[in-house]
Amino acid sequence: MYPIKTPKKLIEVALPLDAINAACAYEKMPGIGAHPRGIHLWWARRPLAAARAVIFAQMVNDPGYQQGGGFKYGVNKEKAEIERERLFKIIEDLVQWENTNNEEVLSRARAEILRSWRDTCELNKAHPLAAELFNPDKLPAFHDPFAGGGALPLEAQRLGLESHASDLNPVAVTINKAMIEIPPKFAGRAPVGPAPDLRGKASQEMFSKQWQGAQGLAEDVRRYG
């Protein structure tokens, strides 16, 4: 069996736990705005902030020097500390509730995930199945066989991974369909429902608006009630 060369991930070395814990506590507060918990009550719902941070840290390689297993990777201790602090700053920004849909913050996180994946692909370019397993232009898919409230597949999708979720409970299946299956099908599309009775500037803004993500779908839900 041909070995796979896998550098240590950031989650195996260190995490900015104080920032993650604070963001998770804030997320549980009432009145913070729209949240997946509003779709349907689900016990043991995982905080979105924790899910986002953990998936990022699982996908990003730790910068520290590593050797053994037929490969060398990373930088010396001093440089690794500086690089780790940079990655921590991304996580600290990523877990903030107000940055949940902040494209600038999400883009930085996605870029780091892709960079680590390409480093891993480069280490494994001699693998007999490299063309199948290590495509540097296609991130590995995310699978959650017991997705429950859907926090993990939702955040994996937000970080640029192709998400797949399943569950034995039909309520969980419905929640995940509503969060990760249906919205991407209508991403970037304008609403199709009856337009509200608007006049003047408000009407012009409604029809000239660029609908990003699932905004058009959300507007349809509001229009139809």
Residue ranges and their predicted role:
Residues 1-225:
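S-adenosyl-L-methionine-dependent nucleic acid methyltransferase catalytic domains
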